[in-house]
Amino acid sequence: MMKKLTAIVLTLALCLTAACMATAETEKTYTIGIAQFAEHSSLDNCREGFIQGLAEMGYVEGENVTFIVQNAQADMGLCQQIAQQMAQECDLVCAIATPMAQAAFNACMDSGKPVIYTAVSDPVAAMLANDEGKSEYNVTGTCDVLPVEAQLKLIRSFLPDAKKIGILYTTSETNSESQLKLYQELAGTYGFEIVASGISTGADIPLACDTLLPQVDCLTNLTDNTVVSYLAVVLDKANALGKPVFGSEIEQVKNGCIASEGVEYVSLGQQTGRMAAQVLEGAFAGDIAFVSSEGGDMCYNPDV
């Protein structure tokens, strides 16, 4: 009788232990860092989409996720500080835009903390992925491929007689350099010449606009974080000379650009959130190839 009782007690104890372990696993709370390079609508939409994508997969703020959100305000020094802090405090880091992704990757490399990036235009050029789209490190994410050819067709349809397109770009942003190169390669096919003006900081934009705008028929934006952050300045300068500005995504069109064949950043962020969920569930980020945005969304501002 005692042996049977002992066996029953042991069985119950094992069941309770297993139940407690399962409950502990289910109730695990993750600290996720969201490190955003700059304050503008494209990156804001990425951030919100990322949170939505995680929620779709069952990772909900206040239930099993705590978010730490910081913005570097396009300051490279602050970018490094945020990345290092999150590498220490977070279980996973979502890095928004190329400079922040590179900083987070470097900060998390030794610890092996996963980095999931988004709004990175060329992960291979940024050294975040190999030619197959993967990595030996714990990093993956999503790529905002600018539909350059579609944008050139759009500009031609709006401006049938235009010859020169102006592009402002930040010389330290590898994403902008990659996009500019693609514009230069394809422009001739549509009868355009690209006139580019490089800047170092947002403070350079007014003078760059004053020099560039008289030389061109219009401007087109890249997914350049500094330029997009100063879009109001660019639009003021261009409007004063009657030169249209074409955006690189829908929010820029809402804010005054004439039209765009650009990226839809909420959807891009949602995809990034779903990828982050895979990593939280045990996948090694480097084994997941980065995902590129699909095509572009044409939008037009009838008030411009």
What are these regions, as identified by a protein language model?
Residues 32, 50, 140-187, 289-304:
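An alpha-beta-alpha
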Residues 31-57, 68-77, 172-174, 226-229, ...:
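Extracytoplasmic "Venus flytrap"
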Residues 122-164, 263-283:
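Hydrophobic alpha-helical segments within soluble ligand-binding/sensing domains
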Residues 174-243, 249:
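Pocket-lining segment of extracytoplasmic ligand-binding domains
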Residues 251-303:
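Flexible loop/turn connectors
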Residues 1-30, 56, 88:
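Short, low-complexity disordered leader/linker segments with a strong preference
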Residues 68-130, 224-239, 243-247:
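Beta-alpha junction/loop-to-helix N-cap segments that form part of ligand/metal-binding clefts
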Residues 58-79, 138-139, 186-202:
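Short beta-strand elements in bilobed, periplasmic/extracellular small-molecule ligand-binding domains
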